[in-house]
Every structure is written in structure tokens, then in C-alpha cells.
């Protein structure tokens, strides 16, 4: 019984993971979240900016350091 439940949960995990991967490939995203690669044609979401050094979306600091 425990094995059946475990296999069922594992199957659901793989199913939803596969569906999420297909959705990401089909539709283009309008913005990118923290830690994702960005460029001029792949902008970061609100609250982040594209690091010129690394090319990743990072947190935006208002006052700077």
C-alpha cells in the first residue's frame, strides 16, 4: 500500500513537471525572475534588473551601496 501511494505521487510529480516544461517551451515569457539569464530582448521582471557583469536578473536596490 505504501509503495502504491509513493509510486502514484512520483507519477504525478513527473506528469506536472513534464507539463510545466512543455508550457515554458511553447509560450514566450514576458519577463525573467531572479537568477535567470537576461539580455536586452529578455527583460527582468519588476523589482529586478539585468546585471551587466553576469547577465542574470538580480534584486534591484533603491539607494545603491
Swiss-Prot record:
Cellular localisation: Secreted
Keywords noted in UniProt: Disulfide bond, Ion channel impairing toxin, Knottin, Secreted, Signal, Toxin
GO cellular component, one term: extracellular region
Keyword Electron transport: no
Pro-peptide positions on chain: 22-29
Main subcellular location of this protein, as a coarse class: secreted
Cystines in this chain: 31-45, 38-50, 44-57
Tissues expressing the protein: Expressed by the venom gland.
Residues spanning the signal sequence: 1-21
Source species, domain of life: Eukaryota
SUPFAM superfamilies xref list: omega toxin-like (SSF57059)
Pfam families per UniProt: Toxin_12
Any one Gene Ontology molecular-function term assigned to this protein's record: toxin activity
Family: Belongs to the neurotoxin 10 (Hwtx-1) family. 31 (Jztx-15) subfamily.
Function: Probable ion channel inhibitor.
Domain remarks: The presence of a 'disulfide through disulfide knot' structurally defines this protein as a knottin.
Protein name as catalogued: U12-theraphotoxin-Cg1a
Phylogenetic classification of the source organism: Eukaryota, Metazoa, Ecdysozoa, Arthropoda, Chelicerata
